């Protein structure tokens, strides 16, 4: 799991189905509040299903992240730069904006990895 660094032993089935969840890196409610309400239905559908915005992660961590932005949730330090870069790439692709608190958090993270490229 990129968010926690844990190895998840996953076997398809009822008892393990919550062990891995697909996260929207930019939560859909965050996207809505930062510009998605102004894009077309087609673009919103693409945003919700774009592999750039989808990531298989630890289920409980995803539930804890919920619809939080980068000012409220960051993964483990080793993945933060990639995570923030991915969020920015999604927001750029779909013309979403960043709140001031989100920007502060993103800048703080990206200052630790100045060579981080957007995916």
Question: What kind of feature is each model-predicted range?
Answer:
Residues 1-57, 62-66:
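Betabetaalpha-Me/HNH-type nuclease active-site subdomain
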Residues 64-119:
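C-terminal, well-folded lobe of enzymatic/effector domains
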